[in-house]
Amino acid sequence: MNFPETLERADSLPDVFEVVKLAAEQHVGRTRGGLMLALADLGNHPRGFLGAFYVIASNVIVMNKVPLVRIRDTQPHLYKHYAFHVLLHEYLHALGYVDEARCRQLVFDLSHTLFGEDHTATQIARDVTRFFPNLVYPDAAWQPADLKLELVANFDRGNTGYIA
């Protein structure tokens, strides 16, 4: 599979997530079905903004819609790469990689292997602050109060056949 071309063809967050799942399966040999994506205004973290978080022992990835919309509107050429980076990071948490440093390293290793050194996804994984200087990663147990979640329809397409 040509991952750069596949990511470039992605038209939506569910499309990007399909690339994330294939990439993780190829690189770490694990998959996880039945995940949901919720968009929410996560506000600001004391050190910057959060891209997303995964609720440990759940099936929900919560993605901060404010930077997502801002990137789409002001830097559309980075939108898919940002979404891939953030969704891959949280998907790896869902696969059991809860240590932040280990998870970040895995995101870089996977991006480098599948996209190559010069690809934007790899460059973001190498140094996310170069592209998004205010992005921070919360502790694994962090959760904001008073979340208003907006679920993304058809997010985990390959794993919903059992739902009536």
Say what each PLM segment does.
Residues V62-L88:
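Short acidic, glycine/tyrosine-flanked loop/strand segments centered on an H-E-D-like triad
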